[in-house]
Amino acid sequence: MESFDADTNSTDLHSRPLFQPQDIASMVILGLTCLLGLLGNGLVLWVAGVKMKTTVNTVWFLHLTLADFLCCLSLPFSLAHLILQGHWPYGLFLCKLIPSIIILNMFASVFLLTAISLDRCLIVHKPIWCQNHRNVRTAFAICGCVWVVAFVMCVPVFVYRDLFIMDNRSICRYNFDSSRSYDYWDYVYKLSLPESNSTDNSTAQLTGHMNDRSAPSSVQARDYFWTVTTALQSQPFLTSPEDSFSLDSANQQPHYGGKPPNVLTAAVPSGFPVEDRKSNTLNADAFLSAHTELFPTASSGHLYPYDFQGDYVDQFTYDNHVPTPLMAITITRLVVGFLVPFFIMVICYSLIVFRMRKTNFTKSRNKTFRVAVAVVTVFFICWTPYHLVGVLLLITDPESSLGEAVMSWDHMSIALASANSCFNPFLYALLGKDFRKKARQSIKGILEAAFSEELTHSTNCTQDKASSKRNNMSTDV
């Protein structure tokens, strides 16, 4: 790390760990998810897609596995992005593609689970109708519709993701409108300045550290911070000659979005319009001294003194809002990708349980029901933190202690959501029959047991029992 002239600042920076505990946990989760998910989902795709007979159940779970497999393919990029602390070295296309794949997985998975829940409910309540209308062709058609809708839902991610260059570091983040005033939410970090008592007549170089306020970046598909809520280490920033000034030690915490400039005007966030910056002379004689009281912040303060409020605070307050597209994306994901499917699934499985208590069902039907319930439960456990953090980031002030805490756990919530991609193959193997019996089965036998068609199985069982009775009768005679 680059040391500063101020001993206290240097000590703080050296004592700060490179990664917070939640960052390390996120890396571990992403690494294990990628390894286990690629192996498990790849095996299920091969066996269920090639070795097994195609049934309605195998169609459902095959497409669900495909969505998980695609998500696992994107995880190495997300893991590297987290390790590199927000730097995105893969270019613009992958900046758009990788977050889109994660959101595609979320919507495809939740829509497929909703379809599976409705299918389970129809089998229990309308078995005769299912025997006549439930077929593989219909299942493939529904899965096709699911993929189309999921693709449409992830289009905003692909459209709004953009690549920004800041001091030779590439940042992958949302760009909702680069032509308007920059948004308060886009970039939030603190720049520590060295002590200096001289004014450079040409260019003042301000070297410092980005404050690790939310720890190294989110990985992700998160709406705001696949960005520089990251610890960008030892980044030099330049001020223009006409705006150079002298100061002792100050903490600057600008908020800027759009395309980050390579030259920052001293004491004025680059997000403010150019005409406002030009209309104010910014130098030490005008308003700033070594003992000027600064705006209070979550850490040590803003570079804006109180007598500067009249010029910029009104506009700063105006820009302190969440972009409308970001609000729409987050709310749509919450409602369409979480709440509505959740209520549909709760209703479906409640009806199934109510009916199963009144009627005797085959073990095969109970087994497939358990698999479906387990998959749905794990999905909502994994994705609930993601949506919760997304909503909290919309409504909390990033300068508050709650806002900082939420941002610090953002990447963890996305790692947990991604972890859902590796669980399903193990659920298929562990549920349905006794585990000791499964351990002696082939992979094909395990999946056939998990995805067995209960209607067909029940019919076959009935036919087997009938033939057995006929054989017994002929033997007795």
UniProtKB/Swiss-Prot annotation:
Disulfide bridges in this chain: 95-172
Keyword line: Cell membrane, Chemotaxis, Disulfide bond, G-protein coupled receptor, Glycoprotein, Membrane, Phosphoprotein, Receptor, Sulfation, Transducer, Transmembrane, Transmembrane helix
TM helices/strands, residue ranges: 24-46, 58-80, 97-118, 140-160, 334-353, 371-393, 411-431
Gene3D superfamilies on file: Rhodopsin 7-helix transmembrane proteins
Cytoplasmic topological domain residue ranges: 47-57, 119-139, 354-370, 432-477
In-chain residues carrying the UniProt-annotated modification Phosphoserine: 452
Domain of life: Eukaryota
Entries under SUPFAM superfamilies matching the protein: Family A G protein-coupled receptor-like
GO molecular function annotations of the record: complement component C3a receptor activity; G protein-coupled receptor activity
Record membrane topology: Multi-pass membrane protein
First-listed, main subcellular location of the protein, grouped into a coarse class: membrane
Any single Gene Ontology cellular-component annotation: plasma membrane
Sites where a glycan is attached: 9, 168, 197, 201
Tissues/organs with expression: Detected in varying levels in all tissues examined except the spleen. Especially abundant in heart and lung.
Membrane topology, Extracellular segments: 1-23, 81-96, 161-333, 394-410
Alphabetical list of PANTHER family matching this protein: C3A ANAPHYLATOXIN CHEMOTACTIC RECEPTOR (PTHR24225:SF28), CHEMOTACTIC RECEPTOR (PTHR24225)
Free-text function comment from the UniProt entry: Receptor for the chemotactic and inflammatory peptide anaphylatoxin C3a. This receptor stimulates chemotaxis, granule enzyme release and superoxide anion production.
Family: Belongs to the G-protein coupled receptor 1 family.
Protein name as catalogued: C3a anaphylatoxin chemotactic receptor
Species in which this protein is naturally found: Mus musculus (Mouse)
Lineage: Eukaryota, Metazoa, Chordata, Craniata, Vertebrata
